[in-house]
């Protein structure tokens, strides 16, 4: 079952991206390095509630 998750920047805490994940394959929280337009650089983004 795929669910929508929100990714937030770890530096400025802004919620920048929405993506989907398969809970069966990825039971843990997702971490991705993505571009944050407020920080102006690529930063680590983590899944939020």
From Swiss-Prot:
Signal peptide: none annotated. GO terms for cellular component: cytoplasm; ribonucleoprotein complex; ribosome. It holds the Pfam family Ribosomal_L33. GO terms for molecular function: structural constituent of ribosome. GO terms for biological process: translation. Belongs to the bacterial ribosomal protein bL33 family. This is Large ribosomal subunit protein bL33.
């Amino acid at each position: 079952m795929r669910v929508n998750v929100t990714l937030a920047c770890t530096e400025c805490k802004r919620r920048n991206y929405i993506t989907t994940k398969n809970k069966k394959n990825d039971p843990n929280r997702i971490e991705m390095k993505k571009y944050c337009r407020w920080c102006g650089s690529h930063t680590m983004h983590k899944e939020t509630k």
